[in-house]
Amino acid sequence: SAASDVYKRQMFVVGNQAAVDTWGDYCYDLTGTPIAGELTTDAYNLYDADGKLCSIGYCYECYGIIVNEDLLEKAGYTLGDITNFETLKAVAEDIHARASELGFDAFTSSSMSDDSSWRFTGHLANLEYYYESVDDPDAWKECPSSIKGTYMQNYKNLWDLYINNSAVNPADLAAGGFDAADEFGKEQAVFYQNGSWEWAKLTGTGDGQYGLDNLSMIPFYCGVAGEENAGLNCGTENCWAVNALSLIHIS
């Protein structure tokens, strides 16, 4: 490893625009390189103000609402029945109303303890930021000092759907002590907000894993016009950069 001096420190992680602003002068321009040619999207690359390709995303994560399709079908629905907030709401409320009959509920718990709340104060809140950036891209070239709040009602609508269609009383969520991953893994709920990093735990068959094998993920449907065409939330701060000065020394 580089830490043990087995090889020279030539590759680094420059993972966001602030890092590019700080270290961009040291980054080799990766434009036209073989690794750049392998990419199928430019969405996760980082450029400096002059258009130099400073770093390239080498992996990314997605998050949204994970769906147990087997349970969904037991409730009488398929993934194709859910295309927007209106249809998600109808399905979730029906499942919740029949939870005793079905043996499972719509959503896992939405605990506000520190080990869970980041899913909602961070990831779910991103729907507000994203749609504001779509409306006004120039205002979001850098992080703005404030938001307009245009889509906060959409955020609230989805949050309310979570907490009102779960086996856990909303009044108890602030106290914490709930394990949404375990609830989902034990097939106690159809829907679970989380991300691709949960895949191994949910589908694996080792200790502490659940062996589920029919999972999908849907976007944060929240009632925004055109959301039928929305995709998952994807991003990364895992971006490789090459130290241009090290290449000078090599040559």
What are these regions (language model features)?
Residues 54-58, 63, 89-143, 189:
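Extracytoplasmic/periplasmic solute-binding protein
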Residues 5-12, 186-194:
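Alpha-to-beta junction loops
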Residues 13-67, 119, 125, 214-219:
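Hinge/lid segment of periplasmic solute-binding proteins
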Residues 73-75, 206-251:
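Extracytoplasmic/periplasmic substrate-recognition and gating elements
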Residues 1-4, 85-87, 172-185:
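Short helix-initiation/N-cap motifs at beta->coil->alpha
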Residues 18-22, 196-211:
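A ligand-binding cleft/hinge motif common to bilobed small-molecule-binding domains
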Residues 2-7, 250:
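Short, small-residue-biased leader/transition segments that mark boundaries at the very start
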Residues 92-93, 137-174, 220:
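Glycine-centered hinge/linker elements that transmit conformational signals in sensory
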